[in-house]
Amino acid sequence: MSRQLLQALEMLESGNWDGAHQIAQEDMTEMGSWLHGVVHIIEGDRGNAEYWYRRAGRRFPGMESVMGEIAAIRSALKG
């Protein structure tokens, strides 16, 4: 699934948050939940973003952290 999550990150970076959201919804792992939270940050939906960060077992970083979170997810996936 990590290949699909990397694809979703590329979608986010190119502005296709809907495509990234579809991938994240299908991945119920902690990484998928983390990515799902980032998608909701981009949407401006703080409540859902916080929910998905909790599901991922991660501290919610705030609404301004998108690029840093994308980089952190990419690094974790390539780890």
Give each language-model segment a name.
Residues 1-3, 29:
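Short, low-complexity N-terminal intrinsically disordered segments enriched in polar/charged residues
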Residues 21-28, 57-58, 78:
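A conserved position within tetratricopeptide repeats
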Residues 28-30, 42-64:
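TPR/TPR-like (Sel1-like) alpha-helical repeat modules
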Residues 37-46, 63-79:
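TPR/TPR-like alpha-solenoid helical repeat scaffolds
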Residues 19-20, 49:
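Solenoid-repeat scaffolds in large eukaryotic assemblies
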Residues 6-10, 39-40:
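Residue-level signature for tetratricopeptide repeat
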Residues 5, 12, 17, 24-25, ...:
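Inward-facing hydrophobic residues that define packing positions of alpha-helical scaffold repeats
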Residues 4, 33-36:
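TPR repeat positional signature
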